[in-house]
């Protein structure tokens, strides 16, 4: 008995270590551990190639938290790591090193064969990624240029590196270096947007004044850039007043997607005064972007009830639909808080609207995440009490069970039982929820649960396939040796 307990304790300890890899904790790297410390962590069972849920692996965590060069080199050489490994947002180590301004590491990664033209999931090369996030060290740029990247290369929409980095280049030292490489402060992108416009996103009035003194022309696009702000900060009211009242830009300017300043700032923190300023300057909250979204639709996708109320008071029709047939209530159900959902309904938002992708129930199911299960339940209760027929099939015959099984979450399916949905309903392809679950299941839990609430395993799809037939083609079940005999 003692032996069994001891073995179980060892297994539990190993499991917990696997779940809490110390090298995936940013605080570990902030202590700047040397190679000996890292080796010690590896010896304890911490995997140097492991990644967290966001796909930040140990190496990218080390780079982003300023670990020393030798330690990072050691980690890159560990099994499972390489300079071509993709991490968070499809970025490779060269992306992170460039953004961090780690010149020695950038040179090392270039020497090791990193792809300098490799784009991440957002379409950014390593140098463009670094420039866009404010890296202004000329040595980083010089390393890429020395390795073959052309200084005058055009990126997305004709942007140059100078345009991307200008807003963070407070003393224009990087700009001075880049102009020596053939770039110019007079460069514009494919839409005619200038260095002034790009710099406006950082909201540095002194820099903007300096650029004007150097002959850089502002355009109305500067306001749109300013309203987007940066990843780390929002533009303040003083900057907007400077752009509108001194530079004389039009407050009702629109971006390339038809959006106004309000579309961009509505979900940022502490914007009430700025929102009122633009409304007073004539910006109409009812203006829609190219997808048909008005400002209320954007605002409703947050938990900021005050902002929703502020915009709703100026919105002509709370039931305006966008190109997908969605109203502001759809956004609230999918992304907003239960309080926002309730408020919109109280203000007359219709609950019986059907968008191209389904009714409010479908949108709610699509938004489900285990960590937000309580909010999900609240919103499910709100819409069910306000006229949404959650048991009715969608236009293609699918029910919420069909949608729900794709989440592979037992708790979600259990929350749907009280809705009295027909678990054996077949869609236009004659597929039941059990059929769909058989295709996407990662284990047998969901499949067995559906059977327990009455799913019929003998029903067939339009191609004469049973749930067993479909499950037998599920590679995940096969690879994990999950028995599906219970579906026969």
Predicted regions and their residues:
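Positively charged n-region of N-terminal signal peptides that target proteins for export
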Residues: 1-4
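N-terminal leader/linker segments that initiate helical-solenoid repeat arrays
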Residues: 6, 16-80, 85-88, 472, ...
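Ankyrin-repeat boundary/"N-cap" motif
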Residues: 20-29, 50-63, 85-95, 119-131, ...
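Ankyrin repeat A-helix N-terminal signature
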Residues: 31-33, 61-68, 96-102, 129-137, ...
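Ankyrin repeat domain, specifically the short helix-to-loop turn at the C-terminus of the second helix
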Residues: 39-47, 73-82, 107-115, 142-151, ...
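Solenoidal tandem-repeat scaffolds enriched in leucines and small polar residues
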Residues: 134-263, 268-271
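Eukaryotic tandem repeat interaction scaffolds
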Residues: 236-426
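Leucine-rich solenoid repeat scaffolds
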Residues: 451, 456-488
């Amino acid at each position: 008995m003692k032996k069994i307990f001891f073995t179980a304790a060892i297994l539990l300890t190993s499991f917990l270590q696997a779940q809490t890899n110390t090298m995936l904790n940013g605080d570990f790297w902030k202590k700047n551990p040397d190679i000996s410390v890292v080796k010690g962590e590896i010896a304890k069972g911490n995997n140097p190639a492991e990644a967290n849920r966001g796909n930040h692996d140990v190496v990218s965590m080390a780079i982003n938290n300023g670990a020393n060069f030798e330690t990072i080199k050691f980690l890159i050489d560990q099994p499972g790591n390489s300079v071509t490994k993709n991490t968070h947002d499809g970025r490779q180590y060269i992306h992170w090193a460039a953004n961090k301004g780690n010149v020695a590491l950038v040179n090392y990664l270039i020497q090791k064969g990193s792809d300098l033209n490799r784009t991440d999931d957002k379409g950014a090369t390593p140098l463009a990624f670094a420039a866009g996030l404010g890296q202004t060290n000329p040595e980083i740029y010089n390393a890429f240029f020395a390795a073959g990247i052309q200084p005058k290369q055009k990126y997305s929409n004709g942007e140059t590196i100078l345009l991307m980095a200008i807003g963070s280049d407070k003393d224009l030292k990087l700009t001075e270096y880049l102009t020596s490489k053939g770039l110019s402060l007079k460069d514009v992108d494919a839409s005619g947007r200038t260095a002034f416009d790009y710099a406006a996103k950082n909201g540095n009035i002194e820099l903007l004044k300096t650029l004007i003194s150097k002959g850089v022309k502002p355009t109305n696009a500067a306001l749109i850039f300013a309203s987007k702000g940066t990843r780390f900060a929002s533009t303040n009211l003083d900057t907007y007043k400077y752009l509108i009242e001194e530079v004389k830009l039009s407050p009702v300017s629109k971006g390339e997607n038809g959006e106004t300043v309000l579309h961009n700032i509505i979900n940022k923190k502490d914007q009430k005064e700025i929102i009122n300023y633009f409304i007073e300057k004539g910006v109409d909250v009812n203006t829609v972007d190219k997808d048909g979204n008005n400002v209320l639709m954007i605002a409703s996708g947050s938990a900021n009830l005050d902002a929703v109320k502020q915009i709703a008071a100026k919105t002509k029709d709370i039931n305006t639909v966008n190109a997908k047939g969605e109203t502001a209530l759809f956004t609230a159900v999918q992304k907003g808080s239960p309080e926002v959902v309730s408020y919109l309904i109280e203000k007359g938002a219709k609950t019986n609207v059907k968008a191209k992708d389904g009714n409010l129930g479908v949108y709610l199911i699509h938004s489900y995440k285990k960590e937000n299960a309580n909010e999900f339940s609240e919103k499910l209760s709100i819409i069910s009490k306000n006229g949404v027929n959650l048991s009715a099939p969608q236009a293609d015959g699918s029910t919420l069970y069909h949608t729900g099984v794709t989440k592979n979450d037992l708790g979600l399916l259990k929350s749907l039982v009280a809705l009295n949905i027909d678990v054996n309903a077949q869609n236009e392809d004659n597929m039941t929820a059990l059929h769909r679950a058989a295709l996407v299941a990662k284990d047998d839990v969901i499949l067995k649960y559906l059977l327990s609430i009455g799913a019929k395993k003998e029903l067939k799809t339009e191609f004469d396939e049973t749930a067993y037939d479909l499950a037998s083609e599920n590679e995940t079940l096969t690879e994990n040796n999950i028995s599906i005999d219970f579906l026969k």
